[in-house]
Amino acid sequence: MVTTTEKTNIGYIRQVIGPVVDVEFPAGKLPQIYNALVIKGKNEAGQDLSVTCEVQQLLGDRKVRAVSMSTTDGLVRGLEVIDTGAPISVPVGEATLGRIFNVLGEPVDELGPVNAATTSPIHRDAPKLTDLETKPKVFETGIKVIDLLAPYRQGGKIGLFGGAGVGKTVLIQELINNIAKEHGGVSVFGGVGERTREGNDLYQEFKESGVIDEKNIANSKVALVYGQMNEPPGARMRVGLSALTMAEHFRDVNKQDVLLFIDNIFRFVQAGSEVSALLGRMPSAVGYQPTLGTDVGQLQERITSTLEGSITSIQAVYVPADDLTDPAPATTFAHLDATTVLSRGLASKGIYPAVDPLDSTSTMLQPSIVGEEHYRTARAVQSTLQRYKELQDIIAILGLDELSEEDRQTVARARKIEKFLSQPFFVAEVFTGSPGKYVKLEDTISGFNRILNGELDDLPEQAFYLVGDIQEAIEKGAKLKAES
């Protein structure tokens, strides 16, 4: 959705090179950087054209260089270009929930127009320092492994690492479900430069799990903004900002806590690199744009907690060739407050969510923030699991019987902890048949403490698998004993 104005400022196309369009305007009427330009007319076959571009450079000699948000097929020299006088604007508010948009805020789900009362420009300044909530606050997700070992910061940024088929989508769905039910919040999903099939699959799964309510679209908990792999680099570079603008409205106007998902933050950088090359800028390290730090910073600095509400962002991070020193992931890491690493090894054991308890990290895991008991419990859980990992080679070669009594006890408790880190999800109920569980942080801490203290050494391992709090594990253990 582009701000439309009267045809007061009209230019003409002088050159088209791929997605880059050079436009000449009358003297003294050059549009500003980031203004949206609209090209309407007919191509040589007589078909209607409607292309939106964003001004990126002022070339001098009354010319500007703009990057197109859609295909430039059919554009020719001399076509009329209208300067809208404002940046690209997208619809915001409740009307966006349950709908799919493109970078321009146009609905692409064939469900008709969006009745949004207001629109917002996608280019905005980050909140002022005086408006920020500076006291770190833990964002409770209700997912045991995350809340205990790698807690999220309210208004923070979390990197989500994981290959195909380890449960990223289900984890995202559960977080969307939990923020809606427990925090009264909403979510915005920004699909940046990923496969169209994945976007469609996600939409269908959201409908199946009830995150999007087909019967009453207003009850949906998420808005989706997609700019897929096949789209021009301009669209992929800006779609993250379109999603962020929708999230900002829920935070600033509705005063809600918002979850913003960006999949994938690397594709945002990649699109910026393509645009930079098209604009003729000198590349920097590994061929990335010279403005890499600025581009990432402008997006990330708008994702924060204010005194009114918060945007907590979970960003899938693709690491090219598994090289963490690559400039794209390295620049992203500088902004992250926590990392959630999904492990294929845990997924193959049937431990879901397959969050790696040793590789996942958080800056929030400090006694001064989470409290002494939480910190001590988390570190004890990690050291127990680390010791189990070290002993696995010995167990594989010599067997459990060759271990000392103390090590055998550590292994038994570690296996219970590993099982207890699994949890039934609300959004997976239709597949597993087990009702989902939201576990409060204090229940999570006390549960793991009781395993570490040896209070539950007599319970079978299986009692801890796919349960909510520790009370449920005790009841399941009693039931298993009775059956045996």
Curated annotation (Swiss-Prot):
Subcellular location, principal: membrane
GO molecular function: ATP binding; ATP hydrolysis activity; proton-transporting ATP synthase activity, rotational mechanism
Enzyme class: translocase
GO cellular component terms given for this protein: plasma membrane-derived thylakoid membrane; proton-transporting ATP synthase complex
The keyword Chaperone belongs to this UniProt entry's keyword annotation: no
Compartments it resides in: Cellular thylakoid membrane
Topology of this chain in the membrane: Peripheral membrane protein
CDD domains named in the record: ATP-synt_F1_beta_C, ATP-synt_F1_beta_N, F1-ATPase_beta_CD
Keyword Metal-binding appears in the UniProt entry: no
Enzyme Commission number(s): 7.1.2.2
Keywords assigned by UniProt, alphabetized: ATP synthesis, ATP-binding, CF(1), Hydrogen ion transport, Ion transport, Membrane, Nucleotide-binding, Thylakoid, Translocase, Transport
Entries under Pfam families matching the protein: ATP-synt_ab, ATP-synt_ab_N, ATP-synt_VA_C
Binding site for ATP: G162, G163, A164, G165, V166, G167, K168, T169
Reaction(s) the record says it catalyses: ATP + H2O + 4 H(+)(in) = ADP + phosphate + 5 H(+)(out)
Assembly and interaction partners: F-type ATPases have 2 components, CF(1) - the catalytic core - and CF(0) - the membrane proton channel. CF(1) has five subunits: alpha(3), beta(3), gamma(1), delta(1), epsilon(1). CF(0) has four main subunits: a(1), b(1), b'(1) and c(9-12).
Family: Belongs to the ATPase alpha/beta chains family.
Function as written in the Swiss-Prot or TrEMBL entry: Produces ATP from ADP in the presence of a proton gradient across the membrane. The catalytic sites are hosted primarily by the beta subunits.
Protein name: ATP synthase subunit beta
Protein source organism: Synechococcus elongatus (strain ATCC 33912 / PCC 7942 / FACHB-805) (Anacystis nidulans R2)
Higher taxonomy: Bacteria, Bacillati, Cyanobacteriota, Cyanophyceae, Synechococcales
Gene: atpD
